């Protein structure tokens, strides 16, 4: 596979941007779904408090509580929510802590400024400050927002997310030159 469109959710979206910023010649485009770019200070503070909790012996309970309370809407499907919470709680502590810490420590501004490939950000909620900052640094950024789903919008309203990605691929990606 050459020049893939890299699609990532949450940390995966941050990784997609990092790939485009560092190795844009290898990436055709990126799609970041619910990636926490340019988080506002209250969110940063909440995550730092959560990081302190998951560094301790009760990390699985802290993780379950945070995911249950912060990443879902009241209307999100209960069974799916429980499956996600339990699967995420299986993540080993030595993986969970640095993964979350790195989402917020990576230089989003440098990554956005260096991104030269088509980029789509699909958010579940309104993040005007984050989107404005991203667009300031990456003017070609396209943004979509799902309706009626929380952080796991790709699982809760996949038709909305997939439709946005499909349209992005049709309109923003030029066909590859014949090999």
Ranges and model annotations:
Residues 141-179:
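Catalytic active-site module of serine/aspartate enzymes centered on a nucleophile-bearing elbow/loop
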Residues 10-13, 23:
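Active-site loop->helix "elbow" adjoining a glycine-rich segment at hydrolase catalytic centers
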Residues 40-45, 57-113:
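Conserved alpha/beta-hydrolase catalytic His-Asp/Glu region
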Residues 8, 34, 122-124:
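Short beta-strand segments
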Residues 5, 29, 118-120:
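Proline-centered loop/turn at the N-terminus of a beta-strand
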Residues 118-155:
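Conserved loop-alpha-helix segment in the C-terminal half of the alpha/beta-hydrolase fold
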Residues 17-22, 26-58:
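Flexible "cap/lid" loop of the alpha/beta hydrolase fold
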Residues 1-10:
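Alpha/beta-hydrolase fold nucleophile elbow
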């Amino acid at each position: 596979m050459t020049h893939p469109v890299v699609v990532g959710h949450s940390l995966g979206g941050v990784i997609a941007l990092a790939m485009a910023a560092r190795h844009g010649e290898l990436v055709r485009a990126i799609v970041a779904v619910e990636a926490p770019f340019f988080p506002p200070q209250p969110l940063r503070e909440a995550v730092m408090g959560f990081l302190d909790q998951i560094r301790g012996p009760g990390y699985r309970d802290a993780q379950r509580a945070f995911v249950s309370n912060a990443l879902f809407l009241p209307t999100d499907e209960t069974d799916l929510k429980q499956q996600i919470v339990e699967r995420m709680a299986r993540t080993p502590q030595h993986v969970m802590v640095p993964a979350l810490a790195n989402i917020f420590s990576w230089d989003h501004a440098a990554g956005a400024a260096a991104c030269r490939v088509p980029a789509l950000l699909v958010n579940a909620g309104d993040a005007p400050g984050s989107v404005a900052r991203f667009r300031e640094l990456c003017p070609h950024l396209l943004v979509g927002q799902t309706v009626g789903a929380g952080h796991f919008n790709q699982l809760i309203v996949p038709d909305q997310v997939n439709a946005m990605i499909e349209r992005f691929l049709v309109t923003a990606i030029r066909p590859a030159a014949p090999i």
